[in-house]
């Protein structure tokens, strides 16, 4: 049976409320269903003491949730749009992210922040941003960005049970996406990426809504004779470098795609790490696709023109496979001969 992203999130919250009396929901209009209807009916089922409306103050909501978590509850708060999670940053950065460290491991912080990100339907510059990189700069936070209904179900349940502060980012464009749910599937691990599609020529790394765009591009490129492996990061902090390394050692070419601006984005961090940790495996520079450094326009046609799309991924992959296999000096020798790691280990 097909379920929408919204229905799957509601089911996950419903089941966790039933499973653990410590789980509480709070946020603006949460008792009335929330801005997108994710929590609809949960207040009637579980009571207004556990599904609670709050004032329109992101800072206050986050502070209340932090206090509740310190007192033994497991709050799941909804910050309506990641654009306004900026108002929660003082508390998130200086309180939940720091308590375990500052207490020497004596305190945990089982707190989940659900928030909506990304451009969809002409919501304009103040309701369309992708600010996930703000959070991955903070030690002590976990950042999750699911790409399908089934992934959202499992990752949300894992986040609620994780025991650490989790920023759970839901792309608005995915809310109407439908998919099937395997009730017997194990819950995904926080910090573990998944190979969404296997391939051998190029590694295409994406997350959230961009995973679907990557899969569509990979399908078209297969008809052109290019095999693209698509990695769904799932968790942006921490990043699963082991899964990435296994793929890069097979394909030797990497493209990273996300909707956020390229400046200081997840792609920039990944490209730097791949370049330093997996340099010997690369036959071409790591390429990135993302938004230009500009606000998201209101006009739908301008919004579409700005956002990275299927065609952008096709161009980038074609550029990667069109390159010769590495710099000229590398092509004169087998891979084992130009590996500085091999040379260093044999010399030592």
Give the residues covered by each predicted segment.
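Flexible glycine-/small-residue-rich
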Residues: 115, 206, 335
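Non-catalytic, usually N-terminal nucleic-acid engagement modules in DNA/RNA processing proteins
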Residues: 168
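Conserved Rossmann-like nucleotide-binding pocket used by diverse enzymes
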Residues: 52, 229, 332
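Thiamine diphosphate
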Residues: 1-165, 304, ...
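Acidic, low-complexity mobile loops and tails
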Residues: 326-348
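Short, contiguous clusters of charged residues that form electrostatic/catalytic patches at enzyme active sites
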Residues: 7-11, 63, 94, 150, ...
